[in-house]
A protein has these predicted regions:
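Extended, largely alpha-helical regulatory/partner-binding modules appended to the mid-to-C-terminal parts
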Residues: 1-116
Length: 116
């Protein structure tokens, strides 16, 4: 999840799509991946607006996970873009749960938010 979040926050559409294709091919649960991605990006965004939340996150995350989130935090130049992305991922999550093509809504959400 952190790897995909990094690609997305770096606006690297090709790496994001490649990662999704590999995860899908390996048989991972894409609905769960999207759910985890939403939670991860929410934490990054929350920490951007309130650095004191790090103390709360320390209770539920490992030190390595906190370090990774802080690294990704530095990539957030426009918080509104991340907010829009999270909204798109939530919509995709709803669509994915009932679709025979679970990859498509997730790919579309990422493409819509990262396309030049």
């Amino acid at each position: 999840t952190a790897a995909l979040a990094g690609y997305i926050l770096e606006d690297d559409l090709e790496a994001s799509l490649r990662y999704l294709a590999e995860i899908n091919e390996a048989g991972f649960n894409l609905v769960q991946l999207n759910k985890d991605l939403i939670h991860y990006l929410r934490r990054v965004l929350a920490l951007k607006f309130d650095p004191q939340l790090e103390e709360v996150f320390k209770r539920e995350l490992t030190p390595d996970e906190i370090t990774e989130i802080k690294k990704h935090l530095s990539l957030v130049k426009d918080p509104n873009k991340v907010i829009d992305l999270i909204k798109s991922l939530i919509r995709a999550y709803s669509e994915m749960r009932y679709s025979p093509f679970t990859l498509v809504p997730l790919e579309i959400a990422i493409i819509e938010n990262l396309k030049g």
